[in-house]
Swiss-Prot record:
Coiled coil: none annotated. Keywords: Cleavage on pair of basic residues, Disulfide bond, Hormone, Pyrrolidone carboxylic acid, Secreted, Signal. The modification Pyrrolidone carboxylic acid is found at residue 20. It comes from Bombyx mori (Silk moth). The keyword Signal applies. The keyword Cell inner membrane does not apply. Residues 50-75 form a propeptide. Its main location: secreted. It is found in: Secreted. This is Bombyxin E-1. Silk worm has two kinds of PTTH: 4K-PTTH and 22K-PTTH; there are four forms of 4K-PTTH. One of its GO terms (molecular function) is growth factor activity. SUPFAM superfamilies: Insulin-like (SSF56994).
Amino acid sequence: MNRPVFLVLLLTGFLCIAAQEANVAHHYCGRHLANTLADLCWDTSVEKRSESSLASYSSRGWPWLPTPNFNKRAIKKRGVVDECCIQPCTLDVLATYC
């Protein structure tokens, strides 16, 4: 087998393995979580998810939308630690925090 064809096949194999690895769920905690977020979000800053984009509409008199304080005990905020440290998550889920 000639060398260029071998290198192309080798590179294709590595890319396939890397693509599969991105879909595997892992636990990301502590410094590993921070470094992974920094690598994923290199062009954006890491921000906390907003509670709801609909919350601002409820103050405008939309009666069918609940108020932001509606049943606060039942609503549990889930953060990146809940989703990716306590439970395993994929890089796709982790990227939603960018």
